[in-house]
A protein has these predicted regions:
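Bacterial Sec-dependent N-terminal signal peptides
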Residues: 1-26
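Short glycine/proline- and aromatic-enriched beta-strand/turn motifs that initiate or cap beta-hairpins
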Residues: 19-77
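Residues on the lipid-exposed face of transmembrane beta-strands in outer-membrane beta-barrel proteins
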Residues: 48, 57-63, 116-122, 141-145, ...
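Outer-membrane beta-barrel translocator/channel fold
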Residues: 77-115, 119-121, 125-129
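Flexible, solvent-exposed coil segments and beta strand-coil junctions
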Residues: 32-41, 91-102, 183-192, 233-236
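Outer-membrane beta-barrel transmembrane domain signature
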Residues: 140-225, 230-242, 246, 259-261
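Residues that define the transmembrane beta-barrel architecture of outer-membrane proteins
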Residues: 40-44, 51-55, 69-71, 110-114, ...
Length: 263
């Protein structure tokens, strides 16, 4: 009985010590959900581009076929300029009906284009890490609608040595060619909206090839820079200049930035 009592006293002491020991609370580990490896089906993005002969902006919709191949369509609005366009300062100072604006000497029309393209993306190198860069080859082609808008100037008519002069806003024609191309008769550029309702359509086609670099931080984001070659062609020569050769085909290098998301 004495041995049993001693054993019970020892067990009671162990239990008492065990009750005073508080088990360590496991530390919480917070980790941002990782989307790496998630299968995406489509992309939506918008962007802007600068060409060696103009600028534009666009919307892109892409369907992901598999990991290395995609197909897309995009619609774009851009402005194309002639390589001989040079901004000229008016020879007149303040004192007329408006402050003179600089103008492009010899320019007779502006060209704006709405294009629809479809194409394919070939992924050349996938991102190996979250901070990596994906490189792709994009090729596309489509149709264009060129809008040729008259470039209007404010011209001076009459004897400039007297007050017997008249200011007229006019577009280029065979009747006013001598005045339109006389810098001493050009007072100012008339403004961007002048000639808007006199635009004429010019059908055409477009094609593009470029390398795209996507370095977005997360897989569901798109942050892409693309560089490449763009070619726009029209049914007829586009009359942009009166003092230089006009063209039917407009090749140009371009760089674009595109932002969007995948889902």
């Amino acid at each position: 009985m004495r041995k049993i009592a001693i054993i019970l006293l020892l067990l009671a002491g162990v239990c008492a010590n065990a009750q005073t020991v508080v088990p360590a609370k496991p530390q919480k580990i917070y980790k941002k959900q990782d989307n790496k490896g998630i299968l995406y089906f489509e992309e939506s993005s918008f962007g802007a581009l600068y060409k060696t002969n103009g600028w534009g902006f666009f919307y892109n919709k892409t369907k992901i076929i598999h990991a290395t191949k995609k197909k897309f369509w995009e619609i774009e609005f851009n402005k194309t300029k002639h390589e001989k366009e040079t901004k000229t300062e008016s020879v007149f100072t303040q004192g007329g009906p408006i402050t003179p604006k600089n103008y492009y000497y010899g320019k007779i029309n502006s060209l704006y284009t709405i294009s629809y393209r479809k194409g394919y993306t070939k992924v050349l190198t996938e991102k190996s890490l979250r901070s990596g860069v994906e490189i792709s080859l994009n090729t596309s082609y489509g149709v264009s609608l060129g809008l040729v808008k008259p470039y209007e100037l404010m011209l001076i008519y009459g004897d400039q040595t007297t007050d017997n002069i008249t200011f007229k806003t006019e577009k280029y024609s065979s009747l006013n060619a001598s005045t339109f191309l006389d810098q001493n008769s050009i007072y100012s550029y008339a403004g961007t909206w002048q000639g808007f309702f006199d635009m004429k359509p010019m059908p055409g086609a477009t094609a593009r090839i470029g390398l795209a670099f996507d370095w977005a931080t997360f897989d569901d984001n798109i942050t892409t820079m693309e560089i490449g070659l763009n070619v726009d062609g029209y049914l007829l020569n586009v009359p942009l200049m009166a003092v230089a050769k006009n063209h039917q085909v407009f090749p140009a290098m371009y760089v674009s930035m595109r932002f969007g998301n995948r889902k």
